[in-house]
Amino acid sequence: AVEEAHLPGRVEHRLVAIGLDGSRQLLASGADFYHSPQVSDDGTQLAWIEWDRPDLSWTRTRLMRATLAADGSVAQVQSVGGADDAWQQPRFDRAGQLCCLSDRSGYWVPWQVAADGPRKLLAIAADHAPAPWQQGSNTWLPLEDGWMALSWSEAGYGHLALRHSVSAEERRLAHAYSRFRHLCSDGKALYCIGASPSCTAAILRIELATGELTRLLGEDSALDAADLSRPERLLYLSAGGESAHGFFYPPRNHAQQLDQPPPLLIFTHGGPTSACYPVLDNRIQFWTQRGFAV
């Protein structure tokens, strides 16, 4: 666990192990921040992310690895990532090999951290995670036999697939959904929270062997399909010739016919903290139902 200690005149972050009896054991200290501790399946390795001020979690971090003894103590602590790279979501595969997302190639994509240095795994040139603002992100998973479960974003839309790290064979999943979070697997199925233009959030189960999708929890919008405004990707030039991105929602109400251009509401955000996603937002539907474009 990541522990935050409020001490006289300062706040200190540390990595600790907490026993079932409530006992606490210090694992790592000295860095300004700690993130995403991960234990290998056999319990013999520990990985985590750490960094110091003035760096941020998406500008420059250290990927750390250590061995775990039977009593929970750590040894052979070493930094295994590049000195000027940013890392997030460390994971151990079934063979105990450390893998992690890094943006050293320009996008957040998975890398395998071998003894001779990091090696990029085959993945689409797109961000497979947002900026790591919070603990607990889980947007990718190493699976059996070189397969990975990956979610990524292209042109604002989220995608989900199984992809082989060597052959690049790919199986797209859950086509109707446009945002995916909190991936996990029991070895037979992939579970996640998915959202779509007609569904705010749903717990999904996807069979790894067949891709069959079952929605375990969550419902579509109660709006009639003719009244549901769906996002349309928008790209326009901003100050300095830069491209700006957005989503346009036209007014939708089968009981109303507009004979003139609708009033337009514009919502801006400072992303990526409060980025906009192409998923059902009832606040937007409130306005499009009443003749507004958003």
Stretches found by the model and what they are:
Residues 41-42, 93-95, 142-145, 185-187:
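Residue-level detector of Asp-centered blade-edge/turn motifs that repeat once per structural unit
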Residues 2-14, 28-34, 49-64, 79-88, ...:
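A flexible loop/linker signature enriched in serine peptidases of the S9 family
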Residues 46, 98-99, 148, 190:
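Hydrophobic beta-strand positions that form the internal "hydrophobic ladder"
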Residues 19-22, 68-72, 114-117, 164-168, ...:
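Short loop/turn segments that connect beta-strands within beta-propeller blades
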Residues 91, 184-189, 193-294:
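Serine-hydrolase catalytic core recognition
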Residues 78, 119-133, 219-231:
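Surface-exposed loop and turn segments in beta-propeller and other repeat-based domains
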